[in-house]
Structures are given as structure tokens and as C-alpha cells.
């Protein structure tokens, strides 16, 4: 009974409901609630390094002064046809908006100067072509994006303009998603054109004369431009390590073996089915079609992020530049600055007897909080649920959950287990091999706990320092198996794990690789002596002409700009192809709505939907029938009820290959008699799996 009670308290109940963001066409509503914090705020350092290639992303944690601050401005203007008059241009709508609210005024640039940017020279052109232009104003620190168009009537030669002023920090995002910005201009133009059917000019004040159209414009301005640009700029994207990086390969096998042991068990083949699908066609589909996605639904942030890291090994394109590491000398100096204070109550925790459990009851009650609860500090559990002994009594009730392979509490490390202080996860993973099936979990738990022992000394006044006892797990862990992850407290001693020292210079969406940019520039603008150009001689009709060859098929894969692959997000973002999101009642419905919107620019939209609560994998494909113009939705079950669904023979062979390959590699790694180099084993096995 208690197990079912805990299972109903999901992750969403703790955080509250998320806005569904559905485009209902009812106009913009004032949005004053606080922006949800990024999911990476309370992420452990090592997990951040695995996902992002560094512990701290540039521009993170600046609050209102961050990269995404600033006001957007929407201006609609028209030409009156009085070329000799100073009042030839009339502004019919001028409003501003931010991510928190829309409809407020924004006067960062004078209208007189802005009208010059919009319409330019008064000299008229002979054609009536539509034009888009972009200008960066250094003085006002804004990007002026303008659409100039004409009405559909032949006798009306007056120009109309839709202008958007965007903060300059969005420049890289605007150039990346220019097609989406152009589509937004088309939507605004479609709203304004019906107003010109009766009159040759727009009303002087659109807010008074056409309030319904203004509401639609502001709604599209907020939903289709402001929010997508903020999401692309501020959401942290995955860093795809090079496939030949030994540190990445070692960490990847460590997470895979941990998942197979803790999450799948001996019967469930969930991970092999997922990796087999990625190897078969799902990973390549992301490159061929921008409307394809991989979405992981989960109530546990840590578990979802670890699964994202595992499946990221099959994603492309991978980074091919140099991987940067933290200087050992700098890391040592930072540790010295974080030494524990010389206080007796901080220095008496660890004794020669190892890790002890207090036998005497204290009169003062201490509210314990595990690392997994840091993001839910406002949730208070009863003291009975925060006690390890009390949790052990209800383990039999939790055992009856669907897909449970033994009690979660039996998987934890005993309280008397004494970890070694100077071991790191990678060192233990590479050098300790036993025949026990639970050896990997014990090594992982012990070594990760030892990596955080110094911080435990400085942050705890109780003798209980073995964090793997997990005395107070978060409620979401009852639904999905708990993951013995890494502590959120910063490590107090220099770690020997090589992957933890990776420090890629980057911001949320780009890698700062000057060497890579220099190579790209040299390849385009090479040495003048090597360019095959010549000068044709002058004649009586014309002078000498310099002829330079043009490379028409010059193409460079994007390496600085990271692909739109992200980790756990507070809500579904259709702009990202790979992401994880919470499980809500309308997540799948909203996903289908986003896929239907993709059909405006693509022939089909496909999503691989992964549910960690029910351990289901299904592929949703939405197409439009060319003859009837109706939308056709097909759903294919890849994995359900603990086994693969009705899949093709080729996919079934891929799943079987991945399962056998991972099992064989795991057995070789655990076999103490195996004399093969473990490093070479991982590299060879990884490249065979990625073929």
C-alpha cells in the first residue's frame, strides 16, 4: 500500500505543473512567473563534464545580466507615398517584449533613426520584390532585422515594413535559425495583408483600429520568436567527444555497465534495444532530417541525463578538434584555497576506526537531505521516511513495483563499508576486476564516495559520512530505479580521473576553438601565391580583368557550432533534436503538435520516444497525404513489456548484436585471468560497436 502511495507522487507533483505552450491563437497572456532554473544548476561536476565537456559553461549563473537578457522590439511601419515630405514613413505599431512579459514599450533606439535603418534610401526601385535585411547597430547594441514587402495590388506601390530589434547577444542564434525568423516574418505578413484589402493604407494606430490582429501579432512575436531564440541561446548543448578519446570511451563503458547491472538486471534488454535502434537508423535520421527527434521522458533528472550520455555515443557530428584539460597546477591551487577550517568539530569526523555510526541518540534533531534532493529543498519528508531503518521496513512493499528486480535497498553499500580515500572512479574501474556481478556497483559506489570525503568533512557535523547509504532518497526514485550517481558536493581533493579534468572553452551553444577557426579561414582564404588566378590583357573595349576561380562546391562541416542536442530540460523544446523532459499528462500530445508543425517545412516528422517509467520505446511518424492533404500518424512499438516489439529482421539482428557485444566486453573486463590490455579492449570494442 505504501509503495503504491509513494509511486503516485511523481516528479511533476514536486515541481508543479509546466506550461504546455500550445499555440491556441488566443493572443499573448502576460507571463510574469519566474523562469524555471536550468536542469544543469544542481548537476554533479563529473556528470556535467560528461555531457558538456566542462564543469562551468561560459555565461552561466549571471541571472538577469546573463546572455539572454534584453528587450525585443516589434515595429510595423508603412510608406505614405509622399517622397518629398519628412513624414513619408508612418509607424503604426511599436511595442516591446521580454521573456517575462510582452506588450510593454521599448524605446532603446529613436524612431527617426530606426526608420532610416528600415527603409534606407528614398530612391525607389523599379521592381516590387520582397527583401529581408539584417543590420547590427553598435551604438544601440541591437540587431535590426527587417522585412520589406508590397501589397498584392498592382496600383499600390507603397512599401510596408516589419522590423524586429533583437539584443546583440542573439546574433549567433539569429544566423543559425534564420529560416525560423523568415517563417515568422511570413506569419506577420499574412496577418497584415487582410487589413489592406479594403484600404490602401494600414490604420494609424493598430492597437485601436485592429486590436484582434495586434493580439495575434504579439502572440506570434512571443511564442514564435522570443521564446525560441531564448531557448537556443541559453540551453546547454551536448559536447560530443571525439570517438578516439580514451577518457570518453572508458567513462562510456563505465556508465553502460552500471546501467546494465543496476537498471536492466539480468532479464530486461531495454538498453540493448535502444542502442540497437540507434545503430540501425535512428542516429543517422537526425542528420538527414532536422524534423527528427529523440525524446526521453523521465521523472528522475540524473537517470535521464545518464541515458542521454550513453546514447550520445551514437550521435553525429562529433567534435574533431583538440580536447582541453585543466592544468594540474591550477587545480592544486584551487584545492588549497578550499581547505576545511581548523575547527575541532570539522576535524573529528574521520577517525582511525573508519566510518562509524553513532549509537547514542541526540536530543537535537537534524534534518538530513541527500544530494538528489538539492533541487527539491522545499519538499519536506517525514522523519520516518528520512531514516534508513524505516526505509528498510517498507522495502518489501516497494519490491512489488513493475519491473523491480530486487529491493533498491539491497543494492546499496553497507554502512560499515570503508571506501579508500585516494581512488577515483576511472582508476577503480580500470584496475579492480572481480567475478562478482555486483562488483562494478560496489567499486563505483565506494570510489565515488571517497572522491567526496573531503567535502563531507567540511559540510557535515555528524559522524555519518557514508553517502551511499542514501538515507533520504527523493520520492521520484521510487518510480524509477535509483542511480548510484556522483555526489553534488565539490570534491575537496584533486581527482585522478582524467575525464574530470576536461575543460573545453565554450558557451551554451558554441565551442571556442581558435585553431579550428584559423584552419577554416586558411582553407577559404589561402596563400595568395597558391591561388590560380590570372589577369586578362586589356583591349580597345575594356581594360585588364583579374579572373579568380570560384569554388562552387565548398562545404565545411560545422565544428564550432554544437548540434541541437541537449540534456534534461524543464519542458519540451521542439527546437532540439535530442532532449529529456518530465513525464506529464500532455507531454506526448504536445510532442505530436510540434511534429505537425514540422510538416510546414518537411515532408515528414519522426520521433523516437523513450519512457523510462514504463520502459517503452516507440517511434512516432507523422506524414501528410499528398492527395487528401490529411495528416497520417503511425506509431511503431520498438520495445514494450520487457521485450522487443514487432520489428524488422534487420533491427532484431542489430539488437542481438549489441546485447552480445556488450555482454562479451563486460565478461572480459571482469575476468581476472584475462591478460588482454583493458584499454585496448575498450577502444576496439567501442569502434566495432560504432560501425
From Swiss-Prot:
Pfam families, A to Z: Longin_2
Keywords annotated in UniProt: Amino-acid transport, Protein transport, Transport
GO biological process: amino acid transport; cellular response to amino acid stimulus; positive regulation of TORC1 signaling; protein transport
Region (Disordered): 17-44, 422-474
Domain uDENN FNIP1/2-type: 67-243
Residue span(s) of domain cDENN FNIP1/2-type: 251-601
Bias (Basic and acidic residues) ranges: 21-34
GO molecular function: GTPase activator activity
Biased composition, class Low complexity, residue ranges: 450-469
Annotated InterPro entries: DENN_FNIP1/2 (IPR037545), LST4_longin (IPR041153)
Residue stretches of biased makeup (Polar residues): 435-449
GO cellular component terms listed in the entry, alphabetical order: FNIP-folliculin RagC/D GAP; vacuolar membrane
Residue span(s) of domain dDENN FNIP1/2-type: 607-687
Function: Involved in extracellular amino acid uptake. Required for the protein trafficking from the Golgi to the plasma membrane.
Recorded family membership: Belongs to the LST4 family.
Protein name: Protein LST4
Gene name linked to the record: LST4
